[in-house]
A protein has these predicted regions:
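N-terminal alpha/beta PP-like core and its mobile active-site loop of ThDP/TPP-dependent enzymes
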Residues: 1-164
Length: 164
């Protein structure tokens, strides 16, 4: 009790290659946290490299499937996933971490901030959208998060269940 398996894999083929292992963890009722990379949130559904619907792939295999959309949500999402994997009937959970959530602010800003000299209305709208996206992605990212150890709950049988 109190232990969980953890696997971290790259997006696309890295995630899809875990399907058999995740199914085995489900059948064995083993708590397992699968952390998978994903295409940047701005590129989802736009033909980005290794952009597949990973959440749908694991919906029937995992107790929970979550995609983190902001840096501030990484720690709470991982904590919740670990609790879910270990609670009730133990089993696997999947947390998707898009690449733009994992990179430092200055790297993401440089990648998407290339429209500094936007021209015309369309350019200004695109620049505004990207700057707003960047602000939302990192909003609250540097605020302290609860990092205390998670409680370990060991289910004990009642006298009725034991049959005294």
């Amino acid at each position: 009790p109190g232990r969980i398996g953890v696997a971290a894999v790259t997006a696309g083929p890295g995630v899809t290659n875990t399907v058999t292992a995740i199914k085995n963890a489900q059948m064995a009722e083993s708590p397992l946290l699968l952390i998978g990379g994903a295409a940047a949130t701005l590129q989802k559904g736009r033909g980005a490299l290794q952009d597949i619907d990973q959440l749908s792939l694991f919906k029937t295999l995992c107790k929970s499937c979550v995609s983190v959309r902001a840096v501030r949500d990484i720690v709470p999402a991982l904590r919740e996933a670990i609790v879910t994997a270990q609670s009730g009937t133990p089993g696997p959970v999947f947390v998707e971490l898009p690449i733009d959530v994992l990179y430092p602010f200055h790297v993401v800003e440089k990648e998407i901030g290339g429209t500094k000299s936007a021209r015309g209305l369309r350019g200004k709208v695109v620049r505004w959208y990207l700057q707003n996206y960047l602000r939302n992605l990192f909003a609250g990212a540097w605020e302290p998060r609860d990092m205390s150890p998670l409680p370990v709950k060991v289910p004990l049988a009642t006298e009725d269940e034991v049959g005294f």
